[in-house]
Design a protein with these regions (language model features):
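Cleavable N-terminal export/targeting peptides
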Residues: 1-31
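Short glycine/proline- and aromatic-enriched beta-strand/turn motifs that initiate or cap beta-hairpins
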Residues: 24-78
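Residues that define the transmembrane beta-barrel architecture of outer-membrane proteins
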Residues: 30, 52-56, 89-93, 108, ...
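Repeated loop/turn-to-beta-strand initiation elements of outer-membrane beta-barrel proteins
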Residues: 32, 66-72, 104-110, 143-148
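Transmembrane beta-strands of outer-membrane beta-barrel pores
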Residues: 38-44, 64, 74-78, 101, ...
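Outer-membrane beta-barrel translocator domains and adjoining extracellular loop/strand segments
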Residues: 44-51, 77-91, 122-130, 151
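Surface-exposed, well-ordered secondary-structure segments
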Residues: 53, 62-64, 107, 117-123, ...
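Mid-chain, structured segments of secreted extracytoplasmic proteins
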Residues: 73-115
């Protein structure tokens, strides 16, 4: 009888130990993602940025479970050269960060942040830089949102 009890105790201990070995690690509060796309044209706020030509775009994003996020994104553009503003400049490089959270436990959310649009390259004489800062605020529900952006320039 003692042998059976010991065997049962050993079997139960082994079962518990093996289930602990397969336990899932806690989810990280950090998320890093990347994206890339090839498009037929880059249109921003109703204005073509590539004059009807294809676009290659991509970026990296970091998000923390607290709601804080940072990212960078880039795309080819042609409008700087098309309008004679810059020489040999075909890149838009954006840097952004903000805070996004839900209202309580609902599906409604808000997003507050800033974005810097950077256009590297040499400007022609007398041309004002196309680089600009924006502040934005968005309200949304699940997959739909409305966003208001304000340029600081």
């Amino acid at each position: 009888m003692k042998t059976t009890a010991r065997f049962g105790l050993a079997l139960a201990s082994a079962a518990l130990a093996s289930s602990a070995a397969f336990a899932q690690a806690p989810a990280s509060p950090h998320t890093v993602t990347a994206n890339v796309s090839l498009g037929s044209e880059y249109i921003f706020r109703g204005i073509s940025q590539t004059a009807g030509k294809p676009t290659l775009q991509g970026g990296f994003d970091y998000a923390h479970s607290s709601g804080v996020y940072l990212g960078t994104w880039g795309s080819n553009v042609s409008w700087l050269e098309d309008f004679g503003a810059y020489n040999r400049s075909s890149l838009e490089w954006d840097f952004y960060g903000g805070y996004k959270a839900n209202f309580g436990s609902s599906d409604f959310f808000y997003d507050l942040g800033t974005i810097y649009y950077y256009y590297p390259g040499s400007k022609n004489p007398g041309v004002v830089s196309a680089d600009s800062w924006e502040l934005y605020a968005a309200l949304g529900w699940k997959w739909v949102s409305a966003k208001l952006s304000y340029s600081l320039d």
